[in-house]
């Protein structure tokens, strides 16, 4: 009769090692992601004031009131983020294509040029655009010379300035995923398309662009998500009439001290972005995001 082999439990031998390696990440996520989200969710269902204190009353009216009172800011956040994402894609795709296929030994240098301005803070970059778009600046002068801006017209404190600032601030978030996706593309596939008498335009839309879709999806997500919650660009490049939801949340949290409304707005914005992202990824037909 052969001896029965010992049973291996969860903590026997090295079976526990994967769980031990997973534990620090789980603790980090639980402490710095799950806990703040749950706290924000709890705050959004409270009522009261900073003087009398807040208490949890499951006040779902905070959500309905927040949505109906700030519909314009909701729509503006989605609109500005969408425009900035589209502009970033139009600007960055040719740039990423050139770096991936034409830059040769200058690839690393060009990538450094793309990211170098972003070694400075977000705030400083935004303030630089305030100088660039100033009424006495060269950009306004060029626009007026070309007849794109009437005499006395201005770019600063307009929706144009806000969208331009958002687009600029998130360009690397679009460029780098696109470059990574294009750089991995097998060039022989493009050559094969040419051998089959496909012109450059046909080869691009039939081969290059579809194969680079993971980079397009990743870039648009990395751009749209932070852009929708941005409030710095409106504060320095726009006016209250261009305010986005991030500006309202900032004001409610730090100025008005209306924590339940601010929390409800934050949760609603997160849920809206999550739904839009889910629909976009499903529509794009890819889950392989680089």
Question: What residue ranges belong to the model's regions?
Answer:
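Membrane-interfacial helix termini and adjacent extracytoplasmic/periplasmic loops
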Residues: 7-11, 126-167, 201, 237-241
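Glycine-rich helix-loop "coupling/hinge" segments at transmembrane-helix boundaries
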Residues: 52-56, 231-257
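N-terminal signal-anchor/first transmembrane alpha helix
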Residues: 1-39, 108
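Cytoplasmic-entry segments and transmembrane alpha-helices of multi-pass inner-membrane transporters
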Residues: 22, 95-132, 190-191, 204-205, ...
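Short membrane-interfacial helix/loop motifs at transmembrane-helix boundaries
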Residues: 4, 33-70, 132, 136-137, ...
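Transmembrane alpha-helices
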Residues: 24-27, 32-33, 116, 168-187, ...
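C-terminal transmembrane helix and the adjacent membrane-cytosol boundary/short C-terminal tail
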Residues: 2-5, 9, 46, 179-190, ...
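Transmembrane alpha-helix signature in integral membrane proteins
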Residues: 68-101
